[in-house]
Amino acid sequence: MAETKIIYHMDEEETPYLVKLPVAPERVTLADFKNVLSNRPVHAYKFFFKSMDQDFGVVKEEIFDDNAKLPCFNGRVVSWLVLAEGAHSDAGSQGTDSHTDLPPPLERTGGIGDSRPPSFHPNVASSRDGMDNETGTESMVSHRRERARRRNREEAARTNGHPRGDRRRDVGLPPDSASTALSSELESSSFVDSDEDGSTSRLSSSTEQSTSSRLIRKHKRRRRKQRLRQADRASSFSSITDSTMSLNIVTVTLNMERHHFLGISIVGQSNDRGDGGIYIGSIMKGGAVAADGRIEPGDMLLQVNDVNFENMSNDDAVRVLREIVSQTGPISLTVAKCWDPTPRSYFTVPRADPVRPIDPAAWLSHTAALTGALPRYGTSPCSSAVTRTSSSSLTSSVPGAPQLEEAPLTVKSDMSAVVRVMQLPDSGLEIRDRMWLKITIANAVIGADVVDWLYTHVEGFKERREARKYASSLLKHGFLRHTVNKITFSEQCYYVFGDLCSNLATLNLNSGSSGTSDQDTLAPLPHPAAPWPLGQGYPYQYPGPPPCFPPAYQDPGFSYGSGSTGSQQSEGSKSSGSTRSSRRAPGREKERRAAGAGGSGSESDHTAPSGVGSSWRERPAGQLSRGSSPRSQASATAPGLPPPHPTTKAYTVVGGPPGGPPVRELAAVPPELTGSRQSFQKAMGNPCEFFVDIM
């Protein structure tokens, strides 16, 4: 049984549909086709079919008679279904499409963009009155209808600033709906499409309705392809592309007498609208463009000398460029700078962020230098001696610290400072992603560029060979790093900057400190194997008090009795002020001397340090704090316990210092305090183990 294949394009969908009718091709009618589409609101569509005209060739013919036979080609029928709201035609007219210059693939895959017949005119009465009374249609069809209405209103309202037409539809349409295309009144006037179009075309002298229709539908099709991208308005489609979002136009004049060749390769862009411009593909070393350094890959070439490339095809642009290069004299190149100088591929710069990102550190440094908001480095107040002694070295050694005052770089400058300046965006050193053996090396530099930069920007190099040695030193010290960790420097290799945080290991906390008040004054401790001198003069020379102590204090004394701080009362407490626990006022010293024969006595009368006076009670002179200085020692070992040190056997009974109170033996300690004896004996065994000074 014979059958007919009907391929039809539905509204804005790019993929066509295929149905088969059990009817011979020469007998199939529009009614047969509509019966197959019973699940669709066919009365809301207009039907166009591929047909052959004797004068114009292949056209799209509208058929509205259900009994009319459908045109067939090679045993199949090609049709386009167009929403009635988006099309107006003269009843019974058989149109001819004027844009036959477009290739057939675009005609087939462009959806309804190319489906307007030449008789399309907004002022002609519509032949579909009453077609919008359908209220129970599917939600998909309603969505399409609303989308078409919105698109029509936008186009009619924005066509070259002309007011929207006052023609209203009688039924089913909102009162602000209007016709959608250019009318005959707009002949001989230029127009610009809506702002949503990313690449705006320039057209003038639209004298034929068919031409106007073709251009508008062409814009509509282009908008559908770019629906997800909100573009910017521009003056010409040939110069507005992704690579020129920054709108930074640069004119470079090159002196060809110094260089033998221009040194660029160009890339052309083409699309269905024609050629889209000439772009810089790559830059060759040794050429005039590479020596200038302002033109980068991805820049769009707008003009060479006095020849404008905007409205020129790619072939003509290449021909003109070759002719200009073959001539003598300087060459002026006008380019539109690419937003990203190192794109992974051409024309992939995102439109969402057309601004080059700033460097926050450089911005902060610049703002602080102008406003004076930050103090000078090295003079800011610090809260501790450690911070004071290391603040200047931290400032000079931390690579990330911004310098408010830029000094000229010399061979004697810190390497980290040279590398920091080298990494600045405007340093002049080309830092970008490189390809090596199909591996992308991010933010890499060429060794030759590093040597040239050092020789140019660092003072003190008499010849380039010295700059090369300096670059080798940068590699040796880790400021530069080879891709495969080679230690020999080569000008032909790619290098990346080393991890700057590793330089923190070279910090010196003592550098930059001055004065004794900023330094720790710990006294030397005796060797653990040496005898611990009890009751004898101390052979160690202890330094005097720092000048920051008040005049009421004298040289740190060493109490042999109960002169330690209130931290003695707790068994497990630890004194953080060990070197100060044995200091006493001159008045207390006299009282001790006066009470030398009267035993230990009570110390509750004396003035105690702040916060601990209430806890001072009468206590034996032999009791010592665990946290007090090891220089404050007690009497002999208690009976029944092993001696703490072999050399302490000779010191069984020890008297206090001259004029001081006598020292009781450890065995005479009251029972309630015997719990601390064991820890005391351990501390006496090896005092260096238990003596910890807290800075």
UniProtKB/Swiss-Prot annotation:
Modified residues (Phosphoserine): 194
Origin superkingdom: Eukaryota
Domain DEP: 425-499
Alphabetical list of InterPro entries matching this protein: DEP_dom (IPR000591), Dishevelled_C-dom (IPR024580), Dishevelled_fam (IPR008339), Dishevelled_protein_dom (IPR003351), DIX (IPR001158), DIX_dom_sf (IPR038207), Dsh/Dvl-rel (IPR015506), PDZ (IPR001478)
Pfam families assigned to the protein according to its UniProt record, in alphabetical order: DEP, Dishevelled, DIX, Dsh_C, PDZ
Cited SUPFAM superfamilies: PDZ domain-like (SSF50156), Ubiquitin-like (SSF54236), Winged helix' DNA-binding domain (SSF46785)
Domain PDZ, first and last residues per copy: 251-323
Compositional bias annotation for Polar residues: 625-636
Gene Ontology BP, a term: regulation of DNA-templated transcription
Biased composition (Basic residues): 142-151, 215-228
Membrane topology: Peripheral membrane protein
Compartmental location: Cell membrane; Cytoplasm, Cytosol; Cytoplasmic vesicle
Region (Disordered): 89-237, 543-667
Keyword entries, A-Z: Cell membrane, Cytoplasm, Cytoplasmic vesicle, Developmental protein, Dwarfism, Membrane, Phosphoprotein, Ubl conjugation, Wnt signaling pathway
Main location: membrane
Any one of the GO CC terms: glutamatergic synapse
Subunit annotation: Interacts with CXXC4. Interacts (via PDZ domain) with NXN. Interacts with BRD7 and INVS. Interacts (via PDZ domain) with VANGL1 and VANGL2 (via C-terminus). Interacts with ARRB1; the interaction is enhanced by phosphorylation of DVL1. Interacts with CYLD. Interacts (via PDZ domain) with RYK. Self-associates (via DIX domain) and forms higher homooligomers. Interacts (via PDZ domain) with DACT1 and FZD7, where DACT1 and FZD7 compete for the same binding site.
Disease: Robinow syndrome, autosomal dominant 2: A rare skeletal dysplasia syndrome characterized by dysmorphic features resembling a fetal face, mesomelic limb shortening, hypoplastic external genitalia in males, costovertebral segmentation defects, and renal anomalies.
Function of the molecule: Participates in Wnt signaling by binding to the cytoplasmic C-terminus of frizzled family members and transducing the Wnt signal to down-stream effectors. Plays a role both in canonical and non-canonical Wnt signaling. Plays a role in the signal transduction pathways mediated by multiple Wnt genes. Required for LEF1 activation upon WNT1 and WNT3A signaling. DVL1 and PAK1 form a ternary complex with MUSK which is important for MUSK-dependent regulation of AChR clustering during the formation of the neuromuscular junction (NMJ).
Free-text comment about domains: The DIX domain promotes homooligomerization.
Protein name: Segment polarity protein dishevelled homolog DVL-1
